[in-house]
């Protein structure tokens, strides 16, 4: 088997820092990569958090960790059991001093399942901290398990008005073979920026069925769904799609 034309690229729709590990893995497999952040992170004001009021903390992203670590003392965050979505997020949390509980979760949904198994049955709530829009909202699952929750928004995403020149050029020249999309929100924002570029030959590797549905509603022809956020899962799907 051979790879597609070496001039084609995989486009990762994510901030540069978070996208680099996947880029490095793909480059080692002779795949060209371009990273295209399509929004910026804007912290929002939130009231001081008394972590003693909660039995556990659920963190959805590295951005959440950075904001909490900046606005909360290390002593405070060490006292509450913390569950993170993904190993990369957990790595950042441990470095920042959070008291992370080890899990085998590979998605927001599987993490919610593990939290439900591990927490105690008491009157304290689960604190969910993250962005204004969550790729997966665990609150209904917790409610079904009779677990109370509190959600605090610490940042929002400001959409970019245009794609970068390099990204636009690759799309215009039909030199993008794969696009990596991590959330329904990212899919929606990207489709707004896509304009009249041809996508029929672009394979979208996306996280979750909600993201897939958004793409299919907008007539995206080639969509692969990844059910967890592990690097190797995304990389393997892209490598396979790049082979003929």
Protein language model regions, located:
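Signature of uroporphyrinogen-III synthase
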Residues: 1-244
């Amino acid at each position: 088997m051979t790879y597609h034309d070496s001039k084609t690229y995989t486009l990762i729709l994510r901030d540069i820092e978070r996208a680099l590990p996947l880029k490095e893995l793909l480059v080692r497999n002779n795949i060209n990569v371009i990273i295209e952040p399509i929004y910026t992170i804007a912290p929002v004001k939130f009231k001081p958090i008394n972590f003693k009021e909660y039995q556990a903390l659920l963190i959805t992203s590295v951005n959440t960790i950075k904001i909490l670590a900046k606005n909360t003392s290390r002593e405070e965050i060490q006292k509450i059991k913390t569950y993170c979505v993904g190993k990369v997020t957990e790595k950042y949390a441990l470095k920042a001093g959070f008291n992370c509980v080890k899990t085998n979760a590979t998605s927001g949904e599987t993490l919610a399942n593990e939290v439900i198994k591990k927490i105690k049955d008491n009157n304290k709530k689960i604190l969910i901290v993250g962005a204004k829009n969550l790729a997966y909202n665990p609150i209904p699952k917790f409610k079904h398990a009779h677990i109370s929750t509190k959600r605090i928004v610490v940042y929002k995403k400001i959409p970019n008005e245009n794609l970068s020149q390099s990204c636009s050029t690759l799309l215009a020249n039909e030199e993008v073979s794969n696009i990596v999309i991590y959330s329904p929100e990212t899919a929606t924002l990207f489709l707004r920026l896509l304009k009249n570029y041809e996508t029929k030959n672009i394979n979208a590797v996306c996280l979750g069925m909600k993201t897939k549905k958004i793409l299919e509603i907008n007539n995206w022809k080639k969509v692969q769904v990844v059910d967890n956020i592990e690097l190797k899962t995304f990389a393997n799907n892209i490598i396979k799609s790049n082979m003929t």
